[in-house]
Amino acid sequence: MRTNRILNIICPPILFLLVGFLFGCVREDIESDMNETSSLFLQVQPYNQRSEEGGVAAYDENTIERLTLVFYKNGTKVWQAEPVETSPSSNSYYVPVPESMYGQFNGNNSFKIYLVANVNFSGSFEPNASETSFLKTLVPNSILLQNDGKPEDKFAMIGSVEKQINMATSEGKQLGSIELKRVAAKLRLKKPVLNISDYELVGDPKAKFRNCMPKGFLSVEEKPEGVGYEAIDYRPMTEANSSVHFYSYYNEWALNNEGRPEFVMMLKLKKTGTDDNTAKPYYYRIPVDGSDKKIRSNHLYDMAVTIEVLGSLNEEDPVTINGSLSVIEWTSHSDDQTLPDVQYLEVIPQETVMNMTTEIELDYFSSHSLLPPADVKATCTYVNSNGQQITDTYTGANVPTVTIDANTKKIKVRSILPINNIPKDISFTIKNSIGFEKKIKIRQNPSQFIINTFGTKSSWQPEGNLAPNLNNKAIYQIVVLSPPADGNMIIGFPPTKEVGFYKKSGSSYTLKHTDRITEQDEQTANMVSPSFELASQLGATLVQDHWEYYTLNPLRLIYHSNQQNRYALMTCAFYWEERKKADGTIERLDDWRLPTRAEIQLVDKLQREQAGVVRDIMTGRYYWSGLPDKAIKILLPTASGNATEQRAHVRCVRDVKNDRFVKSAKRLKK
């Protein structure tokens, strides 16, 4: 049985154009204008495979309807020609050369020759005289999908070669090889793996695509000015077609993710054992976020997802989940094809994540045999209780093993799960016998782990100075991929409710501020956000009451303009903290809340574990949760201070709903 394998090589051809004066291959019935002494000949040999799953049609992704050759000398256009096919479906072409070009094609001039497929250069739409302008031609081909999954137009493709042409010699007429690549990129979402307890799928999953760039330049990586994004409507993932695909021209987006492409997936889910007509549509947002924040020509952005939480019932506010994204050259070859005679090495993927697993397999493709893996190491990076960033290197059995299977073309990585509550960063180098190499990076996450960023200032410390005896500006992030086996922890974003803060004058109340606080019920108290951040010590407080109010029904909380007089609920409602992002911009975080009881207990458990390396996160004796009756006791042996069940410390938290490591959970509704 034929199986398709994705291939990414140094020169990954979609199709090779073999251009030459083919004396032994010229047919006797070629039309009269094809003269062996005055024509260039070329052979188009398409590789008709694509990066696809079995049973999926090719969607005209390799179809060539017309070819245009454009010749440039020193950046100026000198000639344009359309190759003529010698006979239908022969893939053999010739290019008659007019006598006016013989003086140019004399063996002394070097030409940059561009081959363009499926672009209709006619009338006023001619290749520009300037080579720079030609490469910035706005491609007219539409990539928006029709009902059959094919784009409205055939794919524009481009390739080039540099050559000195000499019409006086046979060798001088051979232009060599041209690699032809699509101008557009392909984005594919595979059918999801469903792993939600007590729920099952009804019907086919559907997905649509947002922030498609509908226009692009022929061979320049820029977004065209004045061209807006398009949205492509839902398409189903059926049994016959276990994925959906979309296309886009070059796109790039800023660190704030404006313009980032994304899939929106709809699943109809029902409770196990109930009728199909009880199923409801749940919506998920799946960002396509490559490390370089670009969608590049002739690349396949292949997304796989596992669904472990309920989505949103609101299509306009879908739950964000992060899938496994592979970015590879958009081409493939089946096992029974002969690969071109080129040198290459590719490992897929080069960067990936191992969540709660001790083994992973990577695919590799190499023109030559591989050498043993080199530079295998594993590290972990964390911030200790003194605010110092530490990187430890693993030794002994904690160093991963990397093995290569030349028969299956697999690289197997085995690594013991970290027990120190910190992700393990694995790296190694793969080389082949001719010196090509790939550096591999893998992050291995345990079921619960801690990462961090750093705060710079806060509403409590607007100058950015820590209070006396404090030294840690780390904003710790707690990530829960899987709850403990005891079954007592409920994973999900804790629900919140809106409340008002008032000033009272006589018998009248003036609303000064509204905000959202953690729900104050027992079910919420047992919940743990799948990903939440704790305010740094820039937000450390003295002991406070839980709340102050004028009335309970309706709830009217007391407003204090002086933060030194505030209570726990108000402290988190009004708290903000800033940090510097990777691009140097400042991010202000102002969506804080009181933690749940279970979240405080989880942090306390992690900081007390003997193997853990992040300790002393919450060091007071008691901390307020969302429950008003009494504060939560910290079991850390070194906990100190004057906090009690009724007057306790405050450590605000915030949910991280667009997490780069963990699938986000649905915010539970009241």
From Swiss-Prot:
Extract the signal peptide range.
1-24
Chief location category: other
Q: Enumerate the GO terms in the molecular function aspect.
A: host cell extracellular matrix binding
Q: Which PROSITE patterns match?
A: PROKAR_LIPOPROTEIN
Keyword Transport belongs to the record: no
Question: Which GO biological process categories is it annotated with?
Answer: cell-cell adhesion
Phenotype reported upon loss of the gene: Triple mutants lacking FimC, FimD and FimE show strongly decreased interaction with host CXCR4 and impaired down-regulation of the TLR2-mediated innate immune response, resulting in strongly reduced survival of the bacteria.
Propeptide position ranges:
25-50
Keyword terms: Cell outer membrane, Fimbrium, Lipoprotein, Membrane, Palmitate, Signal, Virulence
Q: According to the Swiss-Prot or TrEMBL entry, at which residues is a lipid covalently attached (S-diacylglycerol cysteine)? A: 25
- Please give the GO cellular component terms listed in this UniProt entry: cell outer membrane; pilus
Residues annotated for lipidation of the kind N-palmitoyl cysteine are 25
Where is it located? Fimbrium; Cell outer membrane
**Miscellaneous comment in the UniProt entry for this protein:** The name (major fimbrium subunit) does not indicate the abundance of the protein, but is derived from the greater length of the major fimbriae. In strain ATCC 33277 and strain ATCC BAA-1703 / FDC 381, major fimbriae are 300 - 1600 nM in length and about 5 nm in diameter. In contrast, minor fimbriae are only about 80 - 120 nm long. This length difference is observed only in a small number of strains, including strain ATCC 33277 and strain ATCC BAA-1703 / FDC 381, and is due to a loss of function mutation in FimB, a protein that restricts fimbrial length in other strains.
Task: Briefly state the protein's biological role.
Answer: Probably a component of the fimbrium tip. These long, filamentous pili are attached to the cell surface; they mediate biofilm formation, adhesion onto host cells and onto other bacteria that are part of the oral microbiome. They play an important role in invasion of periodontal tissues and are major virulence factors. FimC, FimD and FimE contribute to interaction with host CXCR4 and thereby down-regulate the TLR2-mediated host immune response.
Instruction: State the family named in the UniProt similarity comment for this chain.
Output: Belongs to the FimD family.
Q: Tell me, how does this one assemble?
A: Fimbriae are composed of a major, structural subunit and the minor components FimC, FimD and FimE. Identified in a complex composed of FimC, FimD and FimE (in vitro). The complex interacts with host extracellular matrix proteins, including fibronectin and type I collagen. Interacts with host CXCR4.
Q: What name does this protein carry?
A: Major fimbrium tip subunit FimD
Q: Which organism is it from?
A: Porphyromonas gingivalis (strain ATCC 33277 / DSM 20709 / CIP 103683 / JCM 12257 / NCTC 11834 / 2561)
State the encoding gene. fimD
